[in-house]
Amino acid sequence: MAIKELLRQQNMNPKKIKLMATGISGSSASVKQITTMEMPTEELESAMTFEARKHIPMDGTDAVIDYQILGSNEKEVDKIDVGLVACTKGVLNSHIDLLKESGLKPGVIDVDPIAITNAFTFLKDMPSDGLAVLLDIGALSSSLIVWGSGQQYFTRDLPIGGHLSLIHI
């Protein structure tokens, strides 16, 4: 297994890893930003399940849905912006199984665009205004992530990766 071999080559003992954060590929998950009415936390969870089924193309019975409140909507009073994320139980369970088979204890599991964004926000040179853009170029696909200080957030998975560029060279 590639992960076990990588850990071995780096002389890393999986049992000594205190915090594990991983990402599920954007093509295996869906991310959507929506605007909804401000409501108590108890109501928000069931509302987000309904909203996810409405906005995210996925069979709701097999979906694992999570959300994060991004903040108050700047254009509409009494509304909030929410980031919705969904993937299938099968994708999530396969991801967890892969980590466990490698001797790793699953911790934070995010979707790649959000994991990259969270990592980037720890940088000191994060712009206070304007937009920040991240382009994660993978072998077969890429992720474009755009966000700004006013809770603007956009992500798109692109079916173009570095492998395609090498084929054309």
Which role fits each region the language model picked out?
Residues 2, 19, 23-124:
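Active-site neighborhood for divalent-cation/phosphate handling
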Residues 5-18:
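Phosphate/pyrophosphate-binding loops at sites that engage ATP/ADP/AMP, CoA/4′-phosphopantetheine
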Residues 14-16, 76, 136:
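Solvent-exposed loop and beta-edge segments used for protein-protein assembly and interaction
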Residues 18-23, 123-154, 158, 164:
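Gly/Thr-rich phosphate-binding beta-strand-loop-beta motif of the actin/hexokinase/Hsp70
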Residues 93, 162-163:
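Loop/helix-junction capping segments adjacent to catalytic residues or to phosphate/diphosphate-binding pockets
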Residues 113-115, 159-162:
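Residue-level detector of flexible, active-site-proximal loop/helix-junction positions
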Residues 167-169:
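Conserved small/polar residues in nucleotide/adenosyl-binding loops
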